[in-house]
Amino acid sequence: MLEAKDVNFAYLRGQPVINDMDCRIEDGEFVALLGHNGSGKTTLSRLFMALCHPRSGEVLVDGEDIIKREPADLADKIGYVFQNPDLQILEDTVFDEVAYGPRAKKLTEETIKRQVLEALDAMGLTELQKEYPRLLSFGQKRRLGVAAALALNPRTLILDEITNGQDALEKENMMSYLKAINEKRGITIILISHDMDIVRRYAKRAVVLHHGRKVFDGTPKEL
């Protein structure tokens, strides 16, 4: 469970970007964060990952102040996929890209192989595991980023504009895989998006931000 309680935040001496934020996300939810550029969506997700800390209020993970949690513990629980897939891609094979995180944790080779193959299968990339990422389509690179996060067995995935720049088929592929891991594996999905059609068809809940404030919290149908 992730929760922001009466959170306020501003970058350095700038204008506040999160104002009086109360937002609770339960385990296993599929939630979309909506809002125009600068509305606070990405900042809220960064607060949930302890990449920045509130000026006032609390951010909680499983009821505990996130500031008290060890970074490695948070990294195990929350995976983040950047808007630009090239930020997460090195020059190894697809398999090695996904194995990077588990290897950094010094897991056994047997465990690494199992977790990587499960992640590749979950995102429809098994047949591409020996390819090089630079040869993949943009949509495949995006799925590779998700697979790399999945290989660490997170409880929550935060996905920043995960369908941006993809054609209709790539969007459907991406969202069908995300729906499956949410429903079959119980992984919480937090989808940062501008795409109302995607949100309407896949998210179970929508949270709308405007100038750093929550202005709507309900089902996409209600929105």
Regions found by a protein language model. Name each.
Residues 49:
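Helix-to-loop junction immediately C-terminal to a conserved catalytic motif
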Residues 132-136:
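Conserved ABC ATPase signature
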Residues 193-194:
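H-loop/switch region of ABC-family ATPase nucleotide-binding domains
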Residues 110-128:
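Conserved ABC ATPase "signature" region
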Residues 34-36:
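The feature captures the beta-strand-to-loop junction immediately N-terminal to the Walker
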Residues 57-65, 74:
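Conserved ABC transporter NBD signature motif
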